[in-house]
A protein has these predicted regions:
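N-terminal capping/small domains of soluble enzymes
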Residues: 1-103, 323-370
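Glycine-rich phosphate-binding active-site loops on the catalytic face of alpha/beta enzymes
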Residues: 45-55, 119-130, 186-197, 229-251
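Catalytic beta/alpha-barrel core
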Residues: 72-76, 98, 120-125, 137-146, ...
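C-terminal helical cap(s) of enzyme catalytic domains, especially alpha/beta-barrels
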Residues: 38, 56-68, 132, 200-206, ...
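Active-site-adjacent beta->alpha loops and helix N-cap segments on the catalytic face
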Residues: 3-5, 56-59, 78-85, 104-106, ...
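Catalytic cores of alpha/beta
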Residues: 31-39, 104-116, 170-182, 207, ...
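Short beta-strand/loop segments at the ligand-binding rim of alpha/beta enzyme cores
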Residues: 15-23, 90-97, 155-166, 204-216
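Catalytic alpha/beta core domains of metabolic enzymes, predominantly
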Residues: 196-279
């Protein structure tokens, strides 16, 4: 697992995530047994959705009785979830439980009963009328004060919190992301529908939370598109067969081992997200850097100072012969530059190590932009 951490640098719930490929919940289908059959190709899995109080358990029975959907049915959600969690104890897959509840107290009571060994995912995604009428799923996206209250209630119990939601339902997804971040959420699990990478980039530029991109990400090109626009992981639900998962796992592992930064953003001038500031030069000409700094409220002088301070004492401090005297201002390795490459060769810095150092710089930048 140490090799996985060096490769991807992913920690969730204080556990190393082996690969940025995950399984998303599907009611009545994704349980511990489903996950264990695919465990060799994933780093995280969200089982569920599990209804956890009387209104949502009644809604689940209504949906199951309709015959069109599978649901997990039980009389005691705590007992059921303890059984599922116990099955996963020896697995290195980070476990999340996708939960349908109608009140903050329902979530916090469950967290106190189960403890902090799992990620608690609030289901703000389900759009089935019975669930929405019960006060969960997409209900929360139109009543964000209630969703924020659930996040806060869970965080008061000391657990890791994810929120699963569908893009384009809330009045403003960026405002929602900021509200969830401020409330204490740790993860945004986003069903992008047909919104594409531009919407993902907007959310990445709104908050520092770990982002899992979901929906039809079944090939490496699609996966890279999501990762290069702000996602930290991707998840699959209906198409989470072993072959698809294995293919994504192998491809991203190979890419990371070759490139050094598995989810490196596109450069800012090519549509990259805010992390791409690590590739930007001095703010001396009219380009996308200037409006980006203005939008995030970062004066040019502070931007210059921040980058220089961040690379002090690191190999990125070198580069007298580069355009601006330091590798801090140099572009992505995929962009040709003989001055950058001369510096890398002079100081024995591999292209892979260069990209890892740029990843470290981007993390510092994100922590400064989103304190």
């Amino acid at each position: 697992m140490r090799a996985a951490f060096e490769r991807f640098g992913l920690l969730i719930n204080d556990r190393i995530v082996r690969t940025p490929v995950g399984i998303a919940s599907m009611a009545g289908i994704v349980d511990a047994d489903y996950v264990l059959e695919r465990a060799g190709h994933i780093g995280i899995a969200f089982i569920g959705g599990y209804s956890i109080d009387r209104p949502t358990m009644t809604a689940a029975k209504t949906l199951a009785a309709g015959g069109d959907r599978k649901e997990f049915l039980y009389d005691d959600p705590v007992k059921e979830l303890k059984t599922q969690i116990a099955k996963m104890e020896t697995s290195d897959v980070v476990l999340g439980i996708n939960l349908r509840g109608s009140s903050p107290d329902s979530f916090s009571a469950l967290a106190r009963a189960l403890g902090n060994t799992v990620v608690y995912e609030i289901d703000a995604h389900c759009r089935q009328p019975a669930m929405v009428e019960a006060g969960c799923g997409e209900y929360y996206l139109n009543h964000t004060d209630r969703l924020v209250a659930v996040v806060r209630a869970l965080k008061e119990t000391g657990v890791t919190v994810s929120v699963k939601f569908r893009i384009g339902v809330a009045p403003d997804d960026r405002t929602l992301a900021v509200a969830l971040w401020k409330a204490g959420a740790d993860i945004l699990h986003i069903d992008l529908m047909d919104a594409g990478s531009a919407k993902l980039r907007q959310i990445r530029n709104s908050c520092p939370l770990l982002i899992i991109a979901n929906n039809s990400i079944t090939n490496f090109d699609r996966m890279r598109e999501m990762l290069s626009h702000g996602a930290d992981l991707v998840s699959i639900a209906r198409q989470s067969d072993e072959r698809t998962l294995a293919g994504l796992d192998a491809a991203i592992t190979r890419f990371a081992d070759e490139e050094g930064w598995y989810n490196s953003p596109k450069q800012l001038c090519r549509g990259g997200d805010i992390r791409a500031l690590c590739f930007c030069c001095m703010p001396v000409k009219e380009c996308p850097l200037i409006p980006t700094l203005e939008r995030i409220g970062l004066p040019r002088e502070d931007y210059i100072r921040m980058k220089l301070e961040s690379v002090r004492g690191t190999p990125l401090e070198h580069g007298n012969q580069t355009c601006f005297g330091s590798l801090a201002w140099c572009c992505k390795i995929s962009s040709p530059c003989m001055f950058r490459n001369m510096t890398l060769k002079q100081y024995g810095i591999s292209t892979k190590e260069y990209m890892r150092l740029k990843r470290d710089l981007s993390e510092t930048i994100m922590s400064r932009v989103f304190p």
